[in-house]
């Protein structure tokens, strides 16, 4: 018989840096998950060099026998755009102050990377979504 799902926990954790300290510990404690076991598994899965410095969204499914499974998503589009543009953070007033530039090619690469997590029907729709995120961050898109 299949295990009964008792809940889902959604978190955003730095890649390879899950610790029992807040905010991870309290969120998992409420769901009655073995916190250290989750931290070890998450850190092992996200320890690769290409994810270093990114925040990774994770969806943890909790079962009635206190076991769990988790699915990691791709880093947020804003993190990928910030890395591509080489800026620390987006603009406070994106219509006036531009903080960086990304090329059309970089936007396409980000869209392809984000495609599994976006609810876009095509790569073109994903590209438009990433362009919108870049505009709202004050990042210019150059050909």
UniProtKB/Swiss-Prot annotation:
<keyword id="KW-0687">Ribonucleoprotein</keyword>
<keyword id="KW-0689">Ribosomal protein</keyword>
<dbReference type="GO" id="GO:0006412">
    <property type="term" value="P:translation"/>
</dbReference>
<protein>
    <recommendedName>
        <fullName>Large ribosomal subunit protein uL11</fullName>
    </recommendedName>
</protein>
<comment type="subunit">
    <text>Part of the ribosomal stalk of the 50S ribosomal subunit. Interacts with L10 and the large rRNA to form the base of the stalk. L10 forms an elongated spine to which L12 dimers bind in a sequential fashion forming a multimeric L10(L12)X complex.</text>
</comment>
<dbReference type="Pfam" id="PF00298">
    <property type="entry name" value="Ribosomal_L11"/>
</dbReference>
<dbReference type="InterPro" id="IPR036796">
    <property type="entry name" value="Ribosomal_uL11_N_sf"/>
</dbReference>
<dbReference type="InterPro" id="IPR020783">
    <property type="entry name" value="Ribosomal_uL11_C"/>
</dbReference>
<dbReference type="InterPro" id="IPR020784">
    <property type="entry name" value="Ribosomal_uL11_N"/>
</dbReference>
<keyword id="KW-0699">rRNA-binding</keyword>
<dbReference type="InterPro" id="IPR036769">
    <property type="entry name" value="Ribosomal_uL11_C_sf"/>
</dbReference>
<dbReference type="GO" id="GO:0003735">
    <property type="term" value="F:structural constituent of ribosome"/>
</dbReference>
<dbReference type="GO" id="GO:0070180">
    <property type="term" value="F:large ribosomal subunit rRNA binding"/>
</dbReference>
<keyword id="KW-0488">Methylation</keyword>
<dbReference type="InterPro" id="IPR006519">
    <property type="entry name" value="Ribosomal_uL11_bac-typ"/>
</dbReference>
<comment type="similarity">
    <text>Belongs to the universal ribosomal protein uL11 family.</text>
</comment>
<dbReference type="Pfam" id="PF03946">
    <property type="entry name" value="Ribosomal_L11_N"/>
</dbReference>
<dbReference type="GO" id="GO:0022625">
    <property type="term" value="C:cytosolic large ribosomal subunit"/>
</dbReference>
<keyword id="KW-0694">RNA-binding</keyword>
<comment type="function">
    <text>Forms part of the ribosomal stalk which helps the ribosome interact with GTP-bound translation factors.</text>
</comment>
<dbReference type="InterPro" id="IPR000911">
    <property type="entry name" value="Ribosomal_uL11"/>
</dbReference>
């Amino acid at each position: 018989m299949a295990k009964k799902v008792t809940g889902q926990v959604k978190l955003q954790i730095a890649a390879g840096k899950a610790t029992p300290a807040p905010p991870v510990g309290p969120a998992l404690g409420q769901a009655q998950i073995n916190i250290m076991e989750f931290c070890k598994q998450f850190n092992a899965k996200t320890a690769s060099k290409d994810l270093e410095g990114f925040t990774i969204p994770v969806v943890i499914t909790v079962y009635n026998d206190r076991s769990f499974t988790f699915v990691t998503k791709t880093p947020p589009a804003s993190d990928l755009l910030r890395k591509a543009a080489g800026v620390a953070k987006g603009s406070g007033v994106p219509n006036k102050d531009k903080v960086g530039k990304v090329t059309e090619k970089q936007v396409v690469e980000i869209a392809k990377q984000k495609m599994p997590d976006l609810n876009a029907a095509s790569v073109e729709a994903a590209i438009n979504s990433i362009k919108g995120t870049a505009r709202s961050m004050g990042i210019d898109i150059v050909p």
